[in-house]
């Protein structure tokens, strides 16, 4: 409801009159009462709401993904005319969007599955928008979407046509998977600095403030520096009294499931999903901590040197995560015939969304230089970072393993990097085993 309200206010602020409807009359009245003088026109029946709109009608749905979306569409259909456009701005599973697009197209309606990132504030002030569907339908809503989207530093709006049917929601799903990876990498960096150097929250805030001035400049690093110094009403650091169980809404899981369907090694992002799952086993972990032994963390040596190693490891880990995510976008584009433009996708992530970061421009540049590049690690800029920073990543992972500090995504980054650069892997033995017990055959070198 908050995302829908804020998007309606965003659209209204760009000079449009917006018809609003919610199943709950109270919620509709609440929005109108809270925003006097705004060009928001309330309707209390679907029929009146639909009939209030100019044709071709442009209807933005912001409902909980799943059966609720189907129910909302079914309630609209009796009052729609051919050529009307429904925009689904929810966190919808892309296969559902493909199905709805097919079904509505057959009835003469247009359907645009649209990823919207930026949270409640982004919805109000300008989100990153990822629309997918019929190109001609997109052209009819592009003026509105362009006006409400976030604007990057170079003045470009953070919206672009992504591709047919489920492409927009797929890109949003992968965006969310990358977000999981970013957040887990940052959490592991925090754990290393706390466990390896006993940094205070003030020192952590100072460290992240410095990091945010360089290559790691991003929304997530920026908010993390603020989180470290936030205190509760009792004067305690808030981060220290928050239970160490990270919840999830399932979009990271969808990204990992899709990687398995496509045969894509999305190891870092998948580890970040599993890290949330293991965090939720709090009771088991507390019990296991009293039974299972392991090394006690020793201090990591020179403070400035270790902080720099963790910074480098974090940046290279982030690069590996995005390399995996964009590799998966390529595989999905081939599988679903979407013809995705990866440089444009990186561009619209530069503002408005949760993963917005300075280094996304480097991804756009890499694809501008070589649109067909198989993996971002092969692009000159990212190859140089890997050359220069891999020792720091290896040192940090080795330190963590020796000192019993779990770093699943840092470890996944090293494993993926070494596997990807290996001309020969021991998979020949696995294939021999498969042939031995199951006559699966094999190829000769």
Curated annotation (Swiss-Prot):
Changing residue 300 to E: In strain: CT27. It is an enzyme of class 1 (oxidoreductase). Pfam families: 6PGD, NAD_binding_2. The gene is gnd. Coiled coil: none annotated. Keywords: Gluconate utilization, NADP, Oxidoreductase, Pentose shunt. Gene3D superfamilies: 6-Phosphogluconate Dehydrogenase, domain 3 (1.20.5.320), N-(1-d-carboxylethyl)-l-norvaline Dehydrogenase, domain 2 (1.10.1040.10), NAD(P)-binding Rossmann-like Domain (3.40.50.720). Its EC number is 1.1.1.44. This is 6-phosphogluconate dehydrogenase, decarboxylating. GO terms for molecular function: NADP binding; phosphogluconate dehydrogenase (decarboxylating) activity. Catalyzes the oxidative decarboxylation of 6-phosphogluconate to ribulose 5-phosphate and CO(2), with concomitant reduction of NADP to NADPH. It comes from Citrobacter koseri (Citrobacter diversus). It catalyses: 6-phospho-D-gluconate + NADP(+) = D-ribulose 5-phosphate + CO2 + NADPH. InterPro entries: 6-PGluconate_DH-like_C_sf, 6PGD_dom2, 6PGDH_C, 6PGDH_Gnd/GntZ, 6PGDH_NADP-bd, 6PGdom_BS, NAD(P)-bd_dom_sf, Pgluconate_DH. SMART domains: 6PGD (SM01350). Pathway: Carbohydrate degradation; pentose phosphate pathway; D-ribulose 5-phosphate from D-glucose 6-phosphate (oxidative stage): step 3/3. NADP(+) binds at residues 1-4, 22-24, 63-65, 91.
